[in-house]
């Protein structure tokens, strides 16, 4: 299986032939596989390893020492997410065996935060964060975001659209960078069907993955303990392979991975499909895995519906009705267990009790 690799310097080139080469790679990658390998991406891999070291130091702290950095009241959209919190929408209800840390790599948009405060909260940092924790996560997020913008411009050209269409939609969006550490299984848990993260698709526009690493039972970086554990991505179904194919998410040397999210699928009417992916656990106890992801979102005021170019009757049936991206985000965060069900009460008219209060107060109309 030949998943295309795109060179970001092709997409930013002044030479039309190079730009078209990059766009053609994205057309095939996102249209057939839902993901692409990216080289010359600008992510500092040495800094990434240094950040992973810092994050491992944080995760190793007792749970009580980390609780002040976890905020359920903002739906864990910033700061620490404790283990057994998030679930996959299309999974079997098993909470993920992981700890996470969320941060927005850019300053919060104040106007958007007034409308969707839980999607645009301020960053939270441990008061005694390990060295390079904050700087490392923010620098990683910004590097991945810049690479993502270039990919979105290339994806627009690949679809015959003005190059800025997708990039413009995500200006001031609720972008977030997440560090993850998948936790060790005990001897009684391995080979029992437990997954580090159940199969799911991301609900955002585009996800950038800089690559992860395993930690052995002594907490040291090491090659994976077997050939079955780690990130796997499911390709689009074909007549020959109706279930698609699970491919290992390890990219060629020096590359990162970008995968399509639900928002990009909706905007393209299914021309690009969101990438299902699963994180499998090793068959031996004591191992952990570290990874990171940057989630690019369209702005919360964007209407999620196929763009005019893709608005066929079939696409309308598949993706109607149109929905505000901020509403979509809230609904999904409830579905995956990060936001409480009561968050859905925000999505409709909230003043039905006004007449009752008037009646109780003796008002006459």
Predicted regions and their residues:
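Peripheral, non-catalytic segments flanking oxidoreductase cores
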Residues: 1-365
């Amino acid at each position: 299986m030949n998943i295309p690799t795109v060179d970001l310097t092709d997409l930013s080139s002044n030479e039309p032939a190079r730009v078209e080469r990059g766009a053609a790679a994205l057309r095939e990658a996102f249209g057939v596989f839902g993901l692409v390998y990216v080289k010359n991406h600008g992510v500092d891999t040495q800094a990434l390893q240094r950040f992973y070291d810092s994050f491992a130091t944080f995760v190793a702290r007792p749970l009580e020492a980390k609780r002040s950095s976890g905020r359920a009241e903002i739906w864990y959209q910033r700061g620490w997410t404790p283990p057994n919190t998030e679930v996959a929408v299309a999974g079997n209800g098993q909470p993920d065996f992981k700890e996470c840390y969320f941060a927005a790599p850019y300053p919060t948009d104040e106007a958007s935060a007034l409308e969707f405060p839980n999607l645009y909260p301020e960053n939270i940092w441990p008061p005694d964060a390990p060295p390079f924790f904050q700087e490392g996560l923010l620098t990683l997020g910004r590097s991945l975001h810049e690479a993502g913008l270039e990919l979105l411009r290339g994806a627009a050209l690949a679809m015959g659209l003005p190059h800025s269409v997708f990039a413009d939609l995500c200006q001031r969006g609720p972008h977030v960078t997440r560090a993850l550490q998948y936790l060790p299984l005990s001897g009684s848990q391995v080979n029992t069907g437990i997954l580090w993260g159940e199969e799911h698709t991301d609900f955002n526009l585009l996800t950038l993955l800089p690559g992860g690493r395993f930690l052995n039972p002594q907490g040291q970086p090491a090659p994976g303990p077997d050939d079955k554990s780690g990130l796997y991505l499911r390709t689009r179904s074909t007549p020959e392979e109706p279930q698609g194919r699970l491919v290992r998410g390890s990219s060629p040397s020096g590359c990162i991975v970008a995968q399509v999210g639900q928002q990009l699928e909706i905007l393209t009417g299914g021309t690009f499909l969101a990438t299902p992916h699963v994180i499998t656990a090793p068959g031996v106890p004591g191992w952990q895995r570290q990874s990171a992801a940057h989630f690019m979102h369209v702005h919360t005021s964007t209407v999620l519906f196929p763009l005019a170019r893709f608005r066929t009757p079939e696409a309308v049936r598949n993706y109607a009705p149109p929905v505000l991206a901020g509403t979509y985000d809230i609904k999904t965060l409830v579905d995956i267990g990060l936001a409480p069900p009561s968050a859905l009460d925000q999505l409709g008219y909230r003043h039905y009790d006004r007449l009752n209060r008037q009646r109780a107060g003796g008002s006459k109309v």
